[in-house]
């Protein structure tokens, strides 16, 4: 659960930063006090919220690493790629589009995550078989 919370937070942070950066002047102009009137306070607020979401995401990620094997936990981070792509292409204010190549790529990512993380109920793992084999020796 902590890993999925981390994924949700990092995905929302990515979307928030993208939304904000499309509404702010270029970073080179940020320190120019003459252009301070061009800065939207809502965009700054969303950037601050996004940075907070990243920090919270890291906290939840650390909690996830305490309980999950790294191979499973790390693969779950890939869900954020699929989530960000889908939301950016779905929400109208991002002006992103679905393409065949991106959709195929995201589908492969999701299939990989499912392959790694779904446990097969009917077939035991190799480790289980090894323990069972040693018990009968």
From Swiss-Prot:
The lineage of its organism: Bacteria, Pseudomonadati, Pseudomonadota, Gammaproteobacteria, Pseudomonadales. GO terms for cellular component: plasma membrane. It comes from the Bacteria. One of its GO terms (biological process) is lipid A biosynthetic process. This is Probable 4-amino-4-deoxy-L-arabinose-phosphoundecaprenol flippase subunit ArnF. Translocates 4-amino-4-deoxy-L-arabinose-phosphoundecaprenol (alpha-L-Ara4N-phosphoundecaprenol) from the cytoplasmic to the periplasmic side of the inner membrane. Pathway: Bacterial outer membrane biogenesis; lipopolysaccharide biosynthesis. Belongs to the ArnF family. The keyword Cell membrane applies. InterPro entries: EamA_dom, Flippase_ArnF, Small_drug/metabolite_transptr. It is found in: Cell inner membrane. The keyword Cell inner membrane applies. The chain crosses the membrane at residues 43-63, 74-94, 98-118. It comes from Pseudomonas savastanoi pv. phaseolicola (strain 1448A / Race 6) (Pseudomonas syringae pv. phaseolicola (strain 1448A / Race 6)). Keywords: Cell inner membrane, Cell membrane, Lipid A biosynthesis, Lipid biosynthesis, Lipid metabolism, Lipopolysaccharide biosynthesis, Membrane, Transmembrane, Transmembrane helix, Transport. One of its GO terms (molecular function) is carbohydrate derivative transmembrane transporter activity. Heterodimer of ArnE and ArnF. PANTHER family: 4-AMINO-4-DEOXY-L-ARABINOSE-PHOSPHOUNDECAPRENOL FLIPPASE SUBUNIT ARNF-RELATED, SMR FAMILY PROTON-DEPENDENT DRUG EFFLUX TRANSPORTER SUGE. It is a multi-pass membrane protein.
């Amino acid at each position: 659960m902590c890993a999925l919370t981390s994924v949700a937070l990092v995905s929302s942070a990515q979307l928030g930063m993208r939304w904000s950066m499309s509404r702010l002047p270029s970073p080179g102009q940020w320190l120019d006090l003459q252009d301070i009137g061009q800065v939207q306070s809502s965009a700054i607020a969303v950037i601050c919220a996004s940075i907070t979401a990243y920090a919270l995401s890291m906290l939840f990620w650390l909690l996830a690493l305490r309980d999950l094997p790294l191979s499973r936990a790390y693969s779950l981070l890939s869900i954020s790629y699929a989530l960000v792509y889908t939301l950016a292409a779905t929400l109208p204010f991002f002006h992103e589009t679905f393409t065949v190549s991106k959709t195929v790529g995201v589908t492969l990512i999701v299939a990989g995550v499912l392959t790694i993380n779904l446990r097969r109920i009917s077939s035991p793992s190799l480790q289980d078989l090894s323990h069972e084999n040693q018990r009968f020796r």
